[in-house]
Amino acid sequence: FLPLVRGAAKLIPSVVCAISKRC
């Protein structure tokens, strides 16, 4: 379970960055 949460926490900021173009 923890690796999944850690993966999501890593993935979400990059998705937000890609959508909003604010990194």
UniProtKB/Swiss-Prot annotation:
Parts forming coiled coils: none
Keyword Disulfide bond: yes
Gene Ontology cellular-component terms listed: extracellular region
Cited InterPro entries: Antimicrobial_frog_1 (IPR012520)
Keywords for the protein's UniProt record, in alphabetical order: Amphibian defense peptide, Antibiotic, Antimicrobial, Disulfide bond, Inflammatory response, Mast cell degranulation, Secreted
UniProt tissue specificity: Expressed by the skin glands.
GO BP annotations listed: defense response to Gram-negative bacterium; defense response to Gram-positive bacterium; histamine secretion by mast cell; positive regulation of mast cell degranulation
Pfam families reported for this sequence: Antimicrobial_1 (PF08018)
Primary location: secreted
Keyword Transcription regulation in annotation: no
Compartment list: Secreted
Cysteine pairs bridged by disulfides in the record: C17-C23
Function statement: Mast cell degranulating peptide. Causes histamine release from rat peritoneal mast cells in vitro. Has antibacterial activity against the Gram-negative bacterium E.coli K12 and Gram-positive bacterium M.luteus NCT C2665.
Homology family: Belongs to the frog skin active peptide (FSAP) family. Brevinin subfamily.
Name recorded for this polypeptide: Brevinin-1SE
Organism expressing this protein natively: Lithobates sevosus (Dusky gopher frog)
